[in-house]
Each structure stands twice: as structure tokens, then as C-alpha cells.
Amino acid sequence: MNRFYFAYGSNMNPDRIRERIPQARLVGKATIKGWRLVERLYADIECAKGCTVEGVLYLVSQTELYRLDAYEGFPNIYGSVQVNAWLDAKHCVNAQTYMMTATTKAARSGRPYPKEYRLICSTGAEYHGVKNEFRREGDPPFGYRGEGWGDAKVRKGAAKLDEWWHPLPDLGGGNAKR
């Protein structure tokens, strides 16, 4: 069974998500309401009335969610949480995302993003056109892929990434709220 997954940090980056779960289908940008993005060494979210977090919505299999669990350190580093992800003003789907555990929050509170991680997140945000809360003055231009990723794994140009874009024809199924 397929599920929606909402990414708000490094998994917004097309290269990163393809490396981790290559069969994920990109749905598009989405927003979760009543949450805010928090910098705790790595991206985190927390409930916050009146706030929103912009990110990217993917359609993934249960097997891919298990793989993401491993990458995210579930259940020790990040816990899984269900959110309502809004695709536009009318369409909302239930999606899984991750939120740091209380122990992780305490250990990482007040610690800034490592530059490499922040640049990976920033590139993903810019690629998808979501609010970029990761970019800092003096950062390299859009398209930065990150050191240590290996040139063989890096897609050259947007044309290759666009081959991966397969929007779903209809989101009105059982998961959609209207």
C-alpha cells in the first residue's frame, strides 16, 4: 500500500531522496499548518499555532517508509507523526513525516545546522520552489550538490531530474480532503 510522505529537510533534495528511496513518486510542494521548522543540528518540526512549514510531498511504498525509518533513526532519533499536508487551498492529504524525539531535542537544542547539511536542504527547497529557510548569505548558487556525494551519483542538469517528475493524475482518492 502506498502512503504520502512529507519532507521538510534534506529529503526535499531530489538527489538525496532518490539515493534513499529511488521508487518514490514526487507529488509536489505542500504545506503543513500548525507546525514550524526548528533548527536543532538537523531540521525538526514542532507544533506552533499560526505557523506553517513548506515542504515536498512524495508517494512511497511501505517498504520505502521502512527504509526512511532507518535513515531517520526511527524510533530513537526521530519519531513518526501524521500530518495534514495541503497541496493547495482545497486539497489536503494525510501524510507521514518525522519529528525529533524528546531526548534528541534536548541533546541538539540550540545547535546550528552543519553547513553541508544546510546546503543540501537549501538546494532542495530552491529546486521545488518552497520557502527556503536554510539559505544563508554567501552560500553557493542554486544547484550545489554537496561534497562527498560522488560525481557518479549526481544528475547533471534539470532535464534528468524532470524525467523523474510524474505528478499523480488525481489526488481525489480516499486520502484527499476537499
Name each region found by the language model.
Residues 1-178:
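Glycine-aromatic micro-motifs
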